[in-house]
Amino acid sequence: IFKTNIIEEEESRVRQFLNLFKEILKVDFDFEDRDNVLRIETVGDITSHVEIMLNSNGYFCKELL
């Protein structure tokens, strides 16, 4: 689960980035949450890879602990 600054209008673009990870099984956004939560289900731990991918494309993305 990640805190992001992704807005609903950018969801499609972000999904394209996330589709590059074959380890991701499911992606869900919660734009009503103040943290614009991104939830992903994966095979294995790719947390840092997701953060790096989104951060390098101009988005804030940090795992919620």
Regions found by a protein language model. Give the residues of each.
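Helix N-cap motif at beta-to-alpha junctions
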Residues: 42-47
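Residue-level signal for inorganic ion chemistry
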Residues: 38
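Short Gly/Ser/Thr- and Asp/Glu-enriched loop/turn motifs at secondary-structure junctions
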Residues: 31-35
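Short amphipathic alpha-helices in soluble, non-transmembrane regions
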Residues: 13-20, 49-58
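Short glycine-/aliphatic-rich beta-strand segments at the starts of folded cytosolic domains
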Residues: 1-6
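Conserved short beta-strand edge segments in small beta-sheet-based binding/regulatory domains
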Residues: 27-29, 57-65
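Short acidic amphipathic segments
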Residues: 18, 24-30
